[in-house]
Amino acid sequence: MNNLKVWLLMAALSAILVLIGGAIGGKSGALLFFLISLGMNLFSYYYSDKVAISMTRSRPVSEEEAPGLYDVVRRLTKRAGLPMPRLYITPSPQPNAFATGRNPAHSAVAVTEGLLRLLNQSELEGVLAHELAHIKNRDVLIGTIAAAFAGAITMISNIVQWGAFFGMGQDDEEGGGGSFIASLLLALIAPVAAMIIQLAISRSREYLADETGARMAGNSGGLANALLKLDSAARRIPMQVNPAASHLFIVNPLSGESIARLFSTHPPISERVKRLNAMAI
């Protein structure tokens, strides 16, 4: 089912790029952006994890730097029958984490500096088990591709809107009116892209990752306590992250910001904690 959603997501986001091309350059623009979208589909499938790592400014971490982190991940992956993912540190004081990659054999888990400082052993195990559950359930590819495409669409929209702004002095015969209309069309692209992301990444996958992760860790209380801590910290400690990648994290890193609601795919923390506590593992 997730493989079908990946292809549907690629097709939908490619269609958005074609619409952008058509708004900019008519049929030739639409054709150009169609070819670009084909290239992006191939790139995002094989390299979207690297895009996600780059968007969050995460860096590789060695076992010498974080032996405790490696120990927990190695123990959990062995228990779950998963290969060892690449591990990264995200330079942010906000405690958070995410997983990325196209399949279990090509996966990565990133944790923030703040997460390693805040959580105790049981809570850290719960968070890492949740991220490994996303890998085990093969949720990470669709989330990572969505982040890569949404980031690209946002960048293209910004470039074209700046071009339209600086071309406002032209008259309609010189194309100024067309550029302005294109910029108005592009202003509608971000909500559409966000809606597609919300449809593609079901909140039920977060609930399933919570449940799978709790069983993997053998303790539902650790993840429940961690979610409460992370949610509280996310409201107090800002995180500089591209909104297009916010859905990758275990809790919304943009809590309290209006744009966070636009891109939010996170179910309420209170409901997630309630379900975990009901498991009583």
UniProtKB/Swiss-Prot annotation:
Catalytic residues identified in the record: 131
A GO CC term assigned to this protein in UniProt: plasma membrane
Localization annotation: Cell membrane
GO BP annotation list: proteolysis
A molecular function (GO) term: zinc ion binding
Record bears the keyword Transport: no
UniProt entry tagged with the keyword Cell membrane: yes
Cofactor binding remark: Binds 1 zinc ion per subunit.
Transmembrane spans: 6-26, 28-48, 140-160, 181-201
Binding site for Zn(2+): 130, 134, 206
Cofactor(s), names only, from the UniProt record: Zn(2+)
EC number(s) recorded for this UniProt protein: 3.4.24.-
Major subcellular site: membrane
Name of this protein: Protease HtpX homolog
Phylogenetic lineage: Bacteria, Bacillati, Bacillota, Clostridia, Eubacteriales
